[in-house]
A protein has these predicted regions:
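Residue-level signature of mid-helix packing/kink "hotspots" within the transmembrane helices
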Residues: 1-9, 93-94
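Conserved MFS/SLC helix-loop-helix module at the cytosolic interface between two early adjacent transmembrane helices
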Residues: 5-44
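A generic transmembrane-helix signature of 12-TM secondary carrier transporters
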Residues: 28, 32-35, 50-51, 117-124
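Short hydrophobic/alpha-helical segments at membrane-entry points of transmembrane helices
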Residues: 45-51, 163-164
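Helix-loop-helix hairpin linking two adjacent transmembrane segments in secondary transporters
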Residues: 46, 83-129
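Cytoplasmic helix-loop-helix junction between adjacent transmembrane helices
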Residues: 50-89
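Juxtamembrane intracellular "pre-TM" segments in multi-pass secondary transporters
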Residues: 136-164
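Pair of pore-lining "gating" transmembrane helices in MFS-fold secondary transporters
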Residues: 161-174
Length: 183
């Protein structure tokens, strides 16, 4: 979860610099590789390392998916689509333990990671084949470190941004406590 929490702050910026499609495909492929690494781990420390890598790459689809919606749509249509996407991502943590329990009952623990390897590789292929690049090169952000730091500092000083993110953090914390208690 630590990798996921930290990297969701950066995927928007990364995709603003390198494009939505490249960032999303790369994220899905890296998640797939991390899942395969977890499945083939021969020690607990390697499993934890691969799980951290999974967390780092897990947030790319959610964050960049929202950016793609924002690129393609505006106004009420964008709001409606973002609400649908948020709802789907909200169901994931609730359904995952149920699906995981069913898989664990019938297959080995490694099978969870093989399934995730396959699903994320398929998602990468689908993005590669069907997702248009929604951020043209002329609209991309320059990858200058000073500009990046300045943008993040500006966001950190923005009261409404910090309030909204604190509310989201508390909501996810509550969800995390619920899921941990259910496990």
């Amino acid at each position: 979860l630590a990798g996921f929490a930290v990297m969701t702050l950066f995927y928007g910026t990364i995709s603003d610099m390198f494009g939505r499609k490249l960032t999303m495909v790369t994220g899905f492929l890296c998640f797939s590789a991390s899942s395969l690494g977890a499945a083939t781990s021969d020690s607990l420390s390697m499993l934890v390392l691969w799980r951290l890598c999974q967390g780092i790459f897990a947030g790319c689809g959610m964050v960049i998916g929202m950016a793609v919606i924002r690129d393609l749509f505006g106004g009420p249509k964008a709001q409606m689509l973002m609400a649908y996407v948020s709802m789907v991502f909200g169901f994931g943590p609730a359904l995952a333990p149920v699906i995981g329990g069913i898989v664990a009952t019938h297959l080995s623990w490694e099978s969870h990671f093989y399934i995730l390897t396959f699903i994320s590789a398929v998602l990468a292929a689908l993005c590669l084949l069907f997702l248009p690049e929604t951020l043209p090169k002329e609209k991309r952000m320059s990858p200058r470190l000073g500009t990046l730091l300045s943008n993040y500092a500006s966001a950190a000083r923005h009261g409404a941004f910090m309030t909204a993110n604190t509310a989201l953090a508390v909501a996810f914390l509550g969800q995390g406590v619920f899921i941990a208690g259910a496990a």
